[in-house]
Swiss-Prot record:
Residues 220-397 form the TrmE-type G domain. Belongs to the TRAFAC class TrmE-Era-EngA-EngB-Septin-like GTPase superfamily. TrmE GTPase family. This is tRNA modification GTPase MnmE. It holds the Pfam family MMR_HSR1. (6S)-5-formyl-5,6,7,8-tetrahydrofolate binds at R24, E81, K124, K475.
Length: 475
């Protein structure tokens, strides 16, 4: 039997001034703190308005006090919450008073995420739900918040548990066949083990697809605007953002450093990075540094929009400089990151080379082999901008109207991919003779381990520490 953890306390609301602030205390027995500060016993799960008292009986503040006996609380322990006025000085005075009153029972300041970690350790929520708490707090879009709420309610965990149950059932059949090889009944054949495995793999693929969508909502995409000077990169940033964020002038090289703005497209955060124009020779040291930073941003990009001038492109095709930029982009981008060629300023090139663009009829040329997708736009008039937004979503595989998405992290995607890989190997083993059954069983076991790591049923202490230290202190 493990010893109970020491009681902890922290300010649970965000730093700064506010109408209300909350100090939270959790532990095996918080009643000494309750009696010292509230001066009375509190009725469980009822808000009581009263004065909060210091060590000399003087009033620190008036507010609401709530007492939650364990295990029916957020952490599974006894919890005391003191809700007062949200000034930082008042909150600090109240927290200090809690620590003084709880000195005799070992009360200490909580570490980041420790309240939620205790909820996990006391089986109030699993690891995926615990992470969803932090994701809900940090959500930058409404879609991300709704998806985090679904994960917090257990939708993601339920999907994982369902997969694990199916894997366990299949493992049981394989183990029975291994343990009783002399039996006339072929457990695997009789129960359609291959069909069960195919179902599991299909279900896992669906969960992984949803998790990828959720990861997009959580992390967003880094989209870099690149190209020669004065091709309209800053104008495109302004058009995508719907605001004048970057300075736009006819003078080439106006943008000397990166300008970053986060926008939303169907709830996905897009981190748009406007960069210094790329050319063979920088005119000065400032521009040279700006160009270096442009390539640095490109190396970390999810998507690069390579802007070219419509008039020049229609008259002469891709210039040597733009061709060189394309070649270097291909070598500098992360594997799999797409390049979109954005042909800008079609409003000032309505009839060139026999091709006409009315200004409201942009078109897309789909990617073909090494050639990037082309989208024709006018950042100044807005023509083609909506088409560009849709193309960005298509490139990352976003499915519009996906209300069932749950939020996922990179570690979840990694675990799902690893489980998928083991199930793929298991499928290969199932096609072989009986001597491969032990390998089949081992691949199923490894797949189950990776799935269990998502909900925390098989997770190292080091990983738990990494996850919970990223929370705010009062959570």
């Amino acid at each position: 039997m493990t010893a109970p953890l020491p009681p902890i306390a922290a300010i649970a609301t965000a730093p700064g001034r506010g109408g209300i602030g909350v100090v939270r205390v959790s532990g095996p027995d918080v009643r000494p703190v309750m009696h010292a500060i509230c001066g009375q016993a509190l009725k469980p799960r009822h808000a009581t308005y009263l004065p909060f008292l210091d060590g000399h009986g003087k009033v620190i503040d008036h507010g609401l006090a709530l007492y939650f006996p364990g295990p029916n609380s957020y952490t599974g322990e006894e919890v005391l919450e003191l809700q007062g006025h949200g000034g930082p000085v008042v909150m600090q005075m109240l927290l200090t008073r809690c620590l003084q009153a709880g000195h005799g029972i070992g009360l200490r300041l909580a570490e980041p995420g420790e309240f939620t970690r205790r909820a996990f350790l006391n089986d109030k929520l699993d690891l995926a739900q615990a992470e969803a708490v932090a994701d809900l707090i940090e959500a930058s879009t409404e879609a991300a918040a709704r998806s985090a709420a679904r994960s917090m309610e257990g939708e993601f965990s339920h999907a994982i548990h369902t997969l694990v149950e199916k894997v366990i059932h299949l493992r049981m059949l394989v183990e029975a066949t291994l343990d009783f090889p002399e039996e006339e009944i072929d457990f695997l054949e009789a129960s359609d083990a291959r069909g069960q495995l195919a179902t599991i793999r299909n279900d896992l693929g669906n969960v992984l697809a949803q998790a990828r969508q959720g990861a997009l909502l959580r992390e967003g995409l880094s989209v870099v605007l690149a190209g020669q000077p004065n091709v309209g990169k800053s104008s495109l940033l302004n058009a995508l953002a719907g605001a004048e964020l970057a300075i736009v002038t006819p003078i080439a090289g106006t943008t000397r450093d990166r300008v970053k703005e986060t926008i939303q497209i169907e709830g996905i955060p897009l981190h748009i990075i406007d960069t210094a124009g790329l050319r063979d020779e920088a005119t000065d040291e400032v521009e040279r540094i700006g160009i270096e930073r442009t390539w640095d941003a490109i190396r970390r990009a999810d998507i690069v929009l390579h802007l070219v001038d419509a008039t020049d492109y229609l008259r002469h095709g891709l210039s040597e400089i733009d061709d060189a930029i394309d070649d270097r982009l291909s070598g500098q981008l992360p594997p799999g990151a797409p390049i979109v060629r954005v042909v800008n300023k079609i409003d000032v090139a309505p009839t060139v080379g026999g091709m006409m663009f009315s200004g409201n009829r942009p078109h897309v040329v789909a990617a073909n082999g090494p050639n990037p997708t082309e989208i024709w736009i006018s950042a100044r008039t807005g023509s083609g901008i909506e088409l560009l937004r849709k193309e960005l979503l298509r490139l990352v595989g976003w499915q519009s109207g996906n209300e069932g998405t749950f939020l996922a992290r990179e570690r979840h995607l990694t675990a799902l991919r690893q489980a998928q890989s083991h199930l793929d190997v298991a499928a290969e083993q199932s096609e072989r003779q009986a001597q491969a059954l032990d390998l089949f069983a081992e691949e199923l076991r490894l797949a189950q381990e990776h799935l269990n790591s998502i909900t925390g049923e098989f997770t190292s202490d080091d990983l738990l520490g990494t996850i919970f230290t990223r929370f705010c202190i009062g959570k």
